[in-house]
């Protein structure tokens, strides 16, 4: 039965990790109705490490762009020195941008999980960023031109600014992709570049978060049995496959549409969560 739950959770992770609707928020909701029959320590680790499947999809889909020594496609010759230089610069921007979230997130991670990993905080963050998306798309974007239309032209300073918004996503319900996209739009980065840079920015952040959770899991005296390993592996594989589809969907979507729909979705979901939390509290 846990393997079926792992498949469902993998689907949820694969969809919500890349769309700006908060994967953590959706996993909190899912945990209310689809609980793994495992220890609390394993479930805490599972909710983070499942992201490995999602982030590996980025590495696979964008391998040609992320690997400075790879061919652009099978028919191309080796990358030119200029293309190699641009790839290394992209990695430097990603690493620079990941620093604030790492510096602030590492010491605060456990405290934030303890105090904000609940329905009500998640609901409020869903609503707040939902409103932010709608306001930015309807009020800010129409009055400001996009100044960065190519990821290779993204300034280092802009990359750092975007990650300062990613720091806000440490609060469950915010959405890592949502926070970085909001930040990118505010500083004049196009929707396409904002989405793509968000994908890349997730690589060090999510690998790092998964490594830390695994380390804490074993450091606290826990062990991983064969069934738990299988459940985690299945969830990661499903998240990987679904993420491939979700990423392609988002990259195509932002070419023709803005993020208003996601803002509305977040607001509706946040309100539903608040009603559910109030109803649950009323029933005791």
Swiss-Prot record:
Disulfide bonds: none
Any one Gene Ontology cellular component term annotated for this protein: plasma membrane
Organism: Lactococcus lactis subsp. cremoris (strain MG1363)
Biological classification of the source: Bacteria, Bacillati, Bacillota, Bacilli, Lactobacillales
GO molecular function terms noted in the UniProt entry: undecaprenyl-diphosphatase activity
Miscellaneous comment as given in the Swiss-Prot or TrEMBL entry: Bacitracin is thought to be involved in the inhibition of peptidoglycan synthesis by sequestering undecaprenyl diphosphate, thereby reducing the pool of lipid carrier available.
GO BP terms, alphabetized: cell wall organization; peptidoglycan biosynthetic process; regulation of cell shape; response to antibiotic
Keyword entries, A-Z: Antibiotic resistance, Cell membrane, Cell shape, Cell wall biogenesis/degradation, Hydrolase, Membrane, Peptidoglycan synthesis, Transmembrane, Transmembrane helix
Official protein name in the record: Undecaprenyl-diphosphatase
Location(s) in or outside the cell: Cell membrane
Classification via Pfam families: BacA
Protein role: Catalyzes the dephosphorylation of undecaprenyl diphosphate (UPP). Confers resistance to bacitracin.
Family the UniProt entry places it in: Belongs to the UppP family.
